[in-house]
Amino acid sequence: MNSVVPEDYVGYTEVTREAYDPEKAKELLAEAGYPDGFEVTFDAPNDRYMNDEQIAQAVAGYLEKVGIKVNLNLMPKANFFSYIKPLENKSMFLMTGWSDASGDGLSLMHDMLYTYDREAGNGGVNRGHYSNAQVDALIDQAFTEMDDTKRGELVAEADKIAREDYAYIPLHFEQDTYAIKDTLNYTPRMNKYVYAWEFSYK
């Protein structure tokens, strides 16, 4: 996973994932004024996503290797989502997931990366309080673009800027397993929805 926009969604673009380079990370920390690292609280659920506790522990381990002390704050989903729901409550660092049934990356961009504005209904799950006027402008423009290809280009550009800002760190897409009778044709959907009319006999 290199982006929040899944393959086959409008706005998906192939992105080269950055190589794991702890020495470079240490250099960047030193350049930023943290030669000895710093301390961070990492909020994550432990029963919502597939292997979420193990993933959070792995992320914490990678951060520890470059000198960032991680206080891992794991909690059940019943507590986690109420804990992070008020966007005024600024988690330092958190792990969450998001999905979208539209097949269009624009919805993901608007919900996750648009500057949060409760009254306007923008950035509803922008839990990192990311704000970039250029990203907002591209998303606004994409909402008025009816051509899928052109809209996809706007979404991809907004995502590129957000990734370069490190607005988020993509980890993975959950993989689903389906058991299907060998007399049927079916291609699973990215949004995990299952519709009977999408099955056909061979």
Stretch-by-stretch model annotation:
Residues 2, 32-49, 91-97, 102, ...:
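Bilobed periplasmic-binding protein-like "clamshell/Venus-flytrap" ligand-binding domains
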Residues 25, 80, 151:
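Acidic, amphipathic alpha-helical patches
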Residues 54, 60, 64-73, 185-187, ...:
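C-terminal amphipathic alpha-helical "assembly" element
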Residues 42, 62-117, 154:
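Periplasmic binding protein-like
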Residues 28-35, 62-69, 83-87, 112-115, ...:
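Structured segments of extracytoplasmic/periplasmic soluble domains
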Residues 1-61, 65, 129-134, 138, ...:
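Append "and occasionally in soluble cytosolic enzymes with long acidic Gly/Pro-rich linkers
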